[in-house]
């Protein structure tokens, strides 16, 4: 009896580790396990063994909704501060540091209550001085060093209304080290490096000032949810609050919401669930739960019974948004909203797609829902054509809503939507990020996992009559409209940069915690690189077309690509042809018929024209591939030119070109292309307005039909066997018996930077976009590939790089800053160096000075080098090239003149790379070189004298940059 009792005791003693209770849902294709620890921590696990990596999200059910009203933006800048370390890492002496951090906190509480400008300047100077003392004990970026040491990728975080989420993609052999780091981070966070990080957040705020989409979203929320935090405050916060922060409020917020019973760990990838949950319990099980993490409740929203309009102003293209209020994310109304969204705007065959976009009645129109924890909304978004008013766009969109309410859409649209939803779900399962992202959404919005898993099944049972009835109840006159006009927003305020003394990088220092993680022994992951001779089959069709084949053994999806080795730089008319065919049909089928049929088959097609290649692609459900391919071939060969459709398309193209000038990010892309290649570059090399208007539309249908006459390759990834796909290509794909050589590419060649010069173009904003570019015409040397890879990790790569540390961490000069040494895309092209920064106008000269300092005298650290090198080793060892990536690795190797993949080449030489190699490489390639400074900004707000000292300043007009 005693033996039996002892046996039972031993059995139950090990149950928590090997057979812990968990929830599952029948029919869940991800086979998710959901655990709940005793302290309330939720853990979602899904196994996907495709590669030895795991996507991890740690999601906290709190966001800007819970920001204190007097310090909005708090949740977001707490997210930033979570990267600064704990008592164990990020510091070389936590005890000595603590009283200084406490003093900084008290000084900020006093500072935020001051209103006199001179008193504030003096108080900030004192904060800066104390911060200098505290910085002696601060080891910046130790969290990033830890992530680099374990081979993590995608180190980041995001904050929204209801969520703050921390992301890492880790090798599967580093779960324990990852858990050890994260448990300390989430339980023992220390706020340090505060004033420089807050300045980086303010730079992020500046970037948002130029985004009219942010304004539209914030204004829409304000009208939909006028007495709820969704409408009363934004995630980034107000300018005033960002400049008057409270460390005390941050600590209180962290203490309340960052508790295990308000957090979920979401993981998908190559993991053993039993071992993983045991590790998580080991490190997170003692985390103290919060006494009250219940989400706050707010007063009911006032009813919306009549239309409400408002107008905002911004530099980007005009738009209109129309929105209705909806229920929260975990209500079953979400099912009907998702179906309704797809009836209106699924990107291919919805009412907006066919009746507004296909017919070119507007520049663009779309619709969709956003469902949050407390409330939701359904949005319509429209952009006008040239000469069209926003009121007209709204009227056209509302007319489509009326069709929905009348049931004026095909009966087969609903089953087509279900097929496409299933296809999208299959695609999502291929991605660890997709799987883990679903877990985050369900946890944050308190959606039961069973409800999530069964959503497609429930939606498939909604009838057309039920949907129409719902639409009539939902789309009332209680909607809001936001008219976004084009112009300068006079409400935006300029704030001068604070005087910040750079904090020490201390990059040669290392905490005992970091050393312990580096010393931890893990079972190594052996690299497995794509074998260019074995991992894909290279066949020939009966028509002698090369066929590259990889079998999909995972699901019923396929990808088929016809690849042509010439592109826009050979003939820029193909880009227009690729757009034009979307609006055409044949003698037997209209353009709308084609869209509806492809959507019914749950297949997509596209013609993409790159600088040096053209691809015709088809993808979707395997069982429908033969019919979809026949449809595509029919359209390519028999497309019927339509003069009216062509003229309308030209109007859209010209309006789109004009709109591009109004977007800061798009404008800078054009400027950069002009700066490195001159007038003939991939952005400007397009048909002129005159050429477009004079062209015969038949020309463009002939161009695509004529692709059948040129040599090309076939790429296939899918479930078909080799002989089966070869037979289908022979039977269905149209190609000439004798294929002609493709037109000759005339590449866009970069202009060497032989002397310092400045190119500046005008854009009125509170910040500038700036790049420094160097190219001395040097051909890529494969023997240096490993050195270049480690150099980029060490110098410009991510949060642990020299650039990030010096420009953002030490000085608060930017939110976004990086630098890389780029190898060319083809072996006969040239290498180049590029630095990038987005910064407040009055920080430009500082950025230039400090960028040149680190370029000319690169900080050298053996400690930082070893971490960078190990990060590259672990990243490449755990990388796997799969699916379509196999083909592109093969094509890339051909272009680069390699007989192995580039990753394998780099890995083979990593062991020989030493710090001195990095130092020598940087001195030879980057230090004291001539640079072309490329700046987009408003001259009257910039230090032009500082620019003139660099070299000749060439002022470009907008017309010169764009070519129109």
Spans of model-derived segments:
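Sec-dependent N-terminal signal peptides
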Residues: 4-13
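Boundary at the C-terminal end of the N-terminal hydrophobic targeting segment
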Residues: 17-19
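N- or domain-start disorder-to-order transition segments that initiate the globular core
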Residues: 25-51, 525-555
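Charge-rich, well-structured scaffold segments of protease-associated domains
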Residues: 36, 94-294, 328, 359-519, ...
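Solvent-exposed coil/turn segments that connect beta secondary-structure elements
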Residues: 39, 48-50, 59-63, 86-87, ...
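His/Glu-based metal-binding/catalytic segments typifying zinc-dependent metallopeptidases
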Residues: 206-209, 292-349, 381, 505-522, ...
């Amino acid at each position: 009896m005693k033996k039996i009792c002892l046996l039972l005791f031993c059995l139950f003693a090990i149950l928590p580790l090997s057979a812990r209770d968990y929830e599952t849902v029948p029919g869940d294709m991800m086979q998710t396990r959901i655990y709940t620890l005793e302290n309330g921590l939720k853990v979602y696990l899904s196994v996907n063994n495709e590669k030895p990596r795991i996507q991890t999200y740690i999601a906290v059910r709190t966001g800007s909704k819970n920001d204190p009203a007097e310090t909005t933006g708090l949740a977001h800048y707490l997210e930033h501060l979570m990267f600064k370390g704990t008592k164990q890492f990020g510091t070389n002496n936590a005890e000595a540091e603590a009283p200084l951090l406490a003093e900084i906190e008290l000084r900020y509480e006093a500072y935020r209550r001051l209103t006199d400008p001179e008193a504030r300047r003096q108080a900030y100077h004192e904060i800066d001085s104390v911060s200098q003392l505290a910085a002696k004990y601060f080891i910046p970026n130790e969290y990033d060093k830890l992530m680099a040491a374990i081979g993590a990728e995608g180190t980041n975080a995001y904050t929204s209304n209801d969520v703050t989420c921390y992301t890492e993609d880790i090798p599967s052999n580093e779960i324990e080290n990852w858990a050890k780091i994260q448990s300390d981070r989430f339980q023992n966070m220390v706020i340090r490096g505060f004033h420089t990080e807050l300045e980086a957040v303010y730079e992020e705020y500046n970037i948002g000032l130029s985004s009219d989409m942010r304004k539209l979203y914030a204004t829409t929320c304000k009208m939909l949810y006028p007495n709820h935090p969704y409408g009363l405050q934004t995630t980034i916060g107000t300018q005033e609050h960002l400049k008057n922060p409270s460390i005390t409020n941050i600590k209180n917020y962290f203490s309340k919401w960052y508790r295990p019973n308000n957090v979920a760990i979401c993981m998908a990838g190559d993991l053993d669930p039993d071992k993983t949950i045991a590790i998580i319990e080991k490190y997170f099980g003692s985390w103290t739960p919060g006494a009250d993490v219940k989400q706050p409740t707010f007063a009911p929203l006032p009813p919306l019974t009549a239309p409400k309009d408002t107008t905002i102003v911004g530099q980007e293209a005009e738009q209109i948004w129309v929105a209705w209020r909806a229920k929260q994310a975990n209500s079953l109304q979400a099912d009907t909203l998702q179906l309704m969204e797809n009836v209106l705007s699924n990107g291919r065959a919805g009412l907006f797609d066919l009746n507004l976009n296909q017919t070119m009645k507007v520049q663009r129109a779309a619709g969709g829902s956003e469902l949050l924890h407390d409330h939701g909304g359904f949005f319509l978004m429209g952009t006008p054509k040239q000469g069209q008013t926003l009121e007209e766009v709204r009227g056209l969109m509302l007319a489509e809503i009326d069709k929905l309410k009348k049931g004026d859409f095909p009966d087969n649209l609903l089953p087509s939507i279900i097929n496409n939803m299933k296809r999208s779900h299959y695609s999502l399962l291929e991605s660890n990020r997709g799987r883990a992202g679903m877990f985050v959404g369900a946890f944050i919005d308190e959606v039961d996992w069973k409800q999530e898993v069964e959503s497609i099944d429930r939606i498939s049972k909604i009838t057309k009559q039920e949907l129409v009835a719902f639409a009539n109840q939902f789309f009332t006159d209680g909607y809001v409209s936001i008219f976004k006009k084009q112009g300068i927003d006079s409400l935006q305020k300029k704030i001068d940069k604070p005087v910040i003394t750079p904090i020490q990088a201390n990059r040669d220092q290392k905490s005992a915690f970091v050393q312990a993680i580096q010393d931890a022994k893990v079972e190594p992951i052996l690299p497995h690189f794509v074998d260019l001779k074995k991992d894909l089959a290279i066949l020939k069709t009966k028509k002698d077309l090369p066929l590259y084949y990889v079998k999909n053994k995972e699901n019923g999806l396929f990808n088929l690509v016809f690849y042509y080795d010439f592109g826009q730089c050979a003939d820029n008319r193909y880009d227009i042809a690729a757009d034009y065919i979307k609006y055409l049909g044949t003698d037997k089928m209209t353009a709308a018929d084609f869209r509806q049929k492809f959507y019914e088959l749950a297949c997509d097609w596209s013609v993409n024209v790159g600088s040096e290649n053209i691809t015709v692609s088809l993808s979707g459900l395997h069982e429908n591939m033969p019919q979809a391919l026949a449809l595509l071939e029919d359209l390519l060969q028999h497309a019927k030119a339509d003069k009216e459709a062509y003229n309308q398309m030209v109007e859209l193209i010209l309006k789109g070109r004009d709109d591009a000038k109004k977007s800061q990010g798009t404008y800078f892309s054009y400027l950069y292309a002009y700066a490195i290649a001159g007038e003939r570059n991939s952005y400007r090399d397009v048909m002129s307005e005159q050429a477009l208007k004079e062209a015969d539309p038949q020309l463009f249908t002939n161009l695509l039909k004529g692709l059948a006459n040129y040599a090309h390759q076939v790429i296939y990834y899918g479930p078909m066997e080799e002989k089966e796909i070869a037979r289908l290509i022979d039977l269905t794909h149209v190609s000439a018996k004798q294929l002609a050589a493709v037109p000759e590419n005339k590449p866009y060649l970069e202009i060497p930077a032989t002397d310092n010069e400045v190119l500046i173009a005008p854009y009125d904003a509170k910040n500038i976009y700036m790049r420094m570019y160097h190219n001395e015409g040097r051909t890529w040397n494969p023997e240096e590939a490993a050195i270049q890879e480690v150099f980029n990790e060490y110098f410009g790569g991510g949060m642990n790089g020299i650039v990030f540390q010096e420009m953002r961490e030490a000085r608060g000069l930017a939110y976004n800053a990086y630098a890389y040494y780029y190898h060319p895309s083809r072996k006969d092209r040239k290498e180049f160096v590029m630095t990038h920064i987005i910064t407040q106008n009055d920080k430009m000269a500082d950025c230039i000075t400090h960028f040149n300092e680190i370029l000319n005298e690169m900080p050298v650290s053996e400690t930082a080098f070893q971490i960078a090198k190990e990060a590259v080793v672990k990243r490449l060892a755990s990388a796997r090239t799969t699916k379509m990536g196999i083909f592109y690795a093969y094509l890339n190797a051909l272009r680069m003149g390699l007989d192995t993949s580039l990753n394998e080449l780099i890995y083979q030489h990593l062991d020989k790379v030493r710090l001195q190699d990095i130092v020598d490489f940087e001195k030879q390639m980057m230090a004291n070189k001539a640079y072309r400074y490329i700046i987009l900004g408003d001259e009257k707000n910039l230090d032009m004298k500082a620019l003139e000292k660099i070299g000749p300043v060439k002022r470009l007009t907008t017309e010169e940059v764009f070519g129109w």
